[in-house]
């Protein structure tokens, strides 16, 4: 076993990486409220895992979406648990993110030189809200349908560009298959990818600059 480790150590300097990770200074004022960002990340990872599991059975069509969700809940082994965990962790992610924002604001973690860390956090907040909007529509039940119709209709109040924006969001003049396809693509591919990129940037900046000091 030691020979295998030595082989990797010679090429990748694993011990130096491990020492850098484990030897980072943690200020004495840090408490449990500084873990809220990490809990938000954990919820996101749970979302990715449970969401990926459901893609094996979910059908993103207006005729089959609701039936496929019912199938997941009633026929798939532990499907009810997977979907329930997905929903619970989604709610928890939003709650932890809000509490994390309050903690950062109240402790001045957004001030110089951490402005960019705050900006990436704001972007992550918008992405999290977008997850909620797009995911809410995927069962394509009455609640999901009318929620999508209302949300996508909001830009219509904007002069000149309002109507084109609505059509861009819906994929057509009215809510239908194109809308569901767009929201499914956003929810399962675009938003997770963007969230992963901005989370990486967020954590790298925290890693570089360290945790902000007490007020």
Swiss-Prot record:
CDD domains hit by this protein: Cytochrome_b_N (cd00284)
Binding, heme b 1: 34, 100, 103, 202, 212
Cofactor: heme b; heme c
InterPro entries, per the entry: Cyt_b/b6_N, Cyt_B6_PetB, Cytb/b6-like_sf, Cytochrome_b_N_euk/bac, Di-haem_cyt_TM
Record text on cofactor binding: Binds 2 heme b groups non-covalently with two histidine residues as axial ligands.
UniProt membrane topology term: Multi-pass membrane protein
One Pfam family cited in the UniProt record for this chain: Cytochrome_B
Keyword Transport on entry: yes
Binding site for heme c: 35, 207
Keywords: Chloroplast, Electron transport, Heme, Iron, Membrane, Metal-binding, Photosynthesis, Plastid, Thylakoid, Transmembrane, Transmembrane helix, Transport
Subcellular location: Plastid, Chloroplast thylakoid membrane
GO cellular component term, pick one: chloroplast thylakoid membrane
PROSITE patterns linked to this entry: CYTB_NTER
Subunit text: The 4 large subunits of the cytochrome b6-f complex are cytochrome b6, subunit IV (17 kDa polypeptide, PetD), cytochrome f and the Rieske protein, while the 4 small subunits are PetG, PetL, PetM and PetN. The complex functions as a dimer.
Described purpose of this protein according to its UniProt entry: Component of the cytochrome b6-f complex, which mediates electron transfer between photosystem II (PSII) and photosystem I (PSI), cyclic electron flow around PSI, and state transitions.
Note: Heme 1 (or BH or b566) is high-potential and absorbs at about 566 nm, and heme 2 (or BL or b562) is low-potential and absorbs at about 562 nm.
Alphabetized PANTHER family for the sequence: CYTOCHROME B (PTHR19271:SF16)
Protein name: Cytochrome b6
